[in-house]
Amino acid sequence: MANLKLLLVGIGNPGQKYVHNRHNIGFVILDSLLDSSSVSYQTNSKYSLARTDEDGVTIFYLKPLEFMNLSGKSVAEIAKKNGISPENILIIHDEIDFEFGKLKLKGGGGHAGHNGLRNIVEKLGTNTFFRLRFGVGKPSITSEVPDYVLSNFLPNEKEKIPELVKVSLQKISDWIRERKNGFQKLSDNQ
């Protein structure tokens, strides 16, 4: 039986000054996924990558290390190198169109002005990948969005992040299970 390959991507900006920014919640969630395992990232100048193999499922964990707006290059490279279809990719990212703490798993769709997603769509040549959207809220003045997403979470938000990360991890686990079940059904019918 063939092996199911999945790619989980947390997007954010590299560097210590961005670690606690709203824009980096994708990195936070992806790191939390790996915290409970004995697997660690292998890092080069372009990305950090980890891999697990369990029960016929290979999962790649990717953190592009070029700035968010260039995330698509690493995503496309890892997907192509490992034969991962866009439908088996999950991008974890901040979402300004959602109030803080709202989480939504979505397949396909536009980039809604998110430059990281825009670049991923451009480099993959499709928008059929999945995304876990983590609501970070948004400023009342549109021109303040760049500064807002590069700002740190407020203290009252920061204290809620561990619980929201747990909910995010459950959504990711559910997505993995659905992909695995769908893959097994497809394999059984061949």
From Swiss-Prot:
Zinc listed as a keyword: no
Q: Name one GO biological process term.
A: protein quality control for misfolded or incompletely synthesized proteins
Which residues carry the site feature described as Stabilizes the basic form of H active site to accept a proton?
94
> What positions does the entry give for tRNA binding?
18, 67, 69, 115
What is one GO cellular-component annotation here?
A: cytoplasm
Specify whether RNA-binding is a keyword of the entry: yes
What InterPro entries does the record point to? Pept_tRNA_hydro, Pept_tRNA_hydro_CS, Pept_tRNA_hydro_sf
MF terms (GO), sorted A to Z: peptidyl-tRNA hydrolase activity; tRNA binding
Q: Which reaction does it catalyse?
A: an N-acyl-L-alpha-aminoacyl-tRNA + H2O = an N-acyl-L-amino acid + a tRNA + H(+)
Locate the site labelled Discriminates between blocked and unblocked aminoacyl-tRNA.
Answer: 13
Active site annotated at which positions?
A: 23 (proton acceptor)
- Which Pfam families does the record match to this protein? Pept_tRNA_hydro (PF01195)
Domain of life, per UniProt, equals Bacteria
Q: Which family does it belong to?
A: Belongs to the PTH family.
Protein name (Swiss-Prot/TrEMBL): Peptidyl-tRNA hydrolase
Question: Which gene produces this protein?
Answer: pth
